Amino acid sequence: MNNIEKAKECLKNGASLVLYDGKEFIEENGKGLSPLLKLLSEKNDLSRFCAADKIIGKAAAMLFALLKIKNVYGEVLSRKAIPILEKYGIKYSFGTVTDSIKNRYGTGICPMEQTVEGIDDADTALKAIKEKIKTMRMNNMKKLGFGRSEESVV
């Protein structure tokens, strides 16, 4: 069994992202892009690893490029991720291919996919993704009643 097959096998144990280099496994759990963003923030050299992920859309493909991962498997892979993976020389395989990645509620397109829609550069994509996450967090805080101006507080 090769490295990507072993990483794929570990996805069945419940991890959302598994990296494997033939000796070491790195398993991450989390929703959306958070496992990839965590790995990026740690600034470790992961270029010798392959990766298996539950869902790989264009945004995730950009982050895999920044991590310098050379081989990925996605249980679900979006068609929009394929040109990015090819551009950065990342081999890919998948369980299912889809036209688009849906948001976690299944009501529309994933906001991260929308964020990178017109972007083809991984560094630019990372900046846009971080800004989108910041905006989404601020909007969620406002919905919870935080972040109101002093004038609106009685």
Regions found by a protein language model. Give the residues of each.
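Conserved mixed alpha/beta catalytic, RNA-binding, or beta-rich assembly cores of soluble enzyme
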Residues: 1-75, 95-97, 102-112
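C-terminal binding/interaction regions
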Residues: 67-70, 82-147, 153-154
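Short, polar loop motifs at secondary-structure junctions
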Residues: 76-80
